Amino acid sequence: MIIPVRCFTCGKPLGHLYAVFKQRVLAGEHPGKVLDDLGLVRYCCRRTLMAHVEWIDDVLIYEKR
């Protein structure tokens, strides 16, 4: 839904890195290289960014009853 502010496992701040990660991957760079450049070496942090799916726009179209 919304990008986590911190890694669920180790607690490293990640929220500020997602926009850069997404922009560079959409530009055609390899995700692994982007994560290396951002300084994410722990696999828990890498998993958090790579596995994130933005569903917030799809969820917001439904009304709450």
Curated annotation (Swiss-Prot):
SUPFAM superfamilies: RNA polymerase subunit RPB10
Enzyme class: transferase
Gene3D superfamilies the UniProt entry points to: Homeodomain-like
NCBIfam families recorded: PRK04016.1
One GO CC term, this protein: DNA-directed RNA polymerase complex
InterPro entries named among the record's database cross-references: RNA_pol_su_RPB10, RNA_pol_suN_Zn-BS, RPABC5/Rpb10
Gene Ontology MF terms: DNA binding; DNA-directed RNA polymerase activity; zinc ion binding
Name of this chain's protein: DNA-directed RNA polymerase subunit Rpo10
Keyword flag Lyase: no
Organism this protein belongs to: Pyrobaculum arsenaticum (strain DSM 13514 / JCM 11321 / PZ6)
Binding site for Zn(2+): 7, 10, 44-45
Subunit description: Part of the RNA polymerase complex.
Location of the protein in the cell: Cytoplasm
Cofactor detail note: Binds 1 zinc ion.
Keyword Transcription: yes
Catalytic activity, as annotated: RNA(n) + a ribonucleoside 5'-triphosphate = RNA(n+1) + diphosphate
Family, per entry: Belongs to the archaeal Rpo10/eukaryotic RPB10 RNA polymerase subunit family.
Role this protein plays: DNA-dependent RNA polymerase (RNAP) catalyzes the transcription of DNA into RNA using the four ribonucleoside triphosphates as substrates.
Cofactors (names): Zn(2+)
Keywords tagged on the record: Cytoplasm, DNA-directed RNA polymerase, Metal-binding, Nucleotidyltransferase, Transcription, Transferase, Zinc
GO biological process, one term: DNA-templated transcription
Its EC number(s): 2.7.7.6
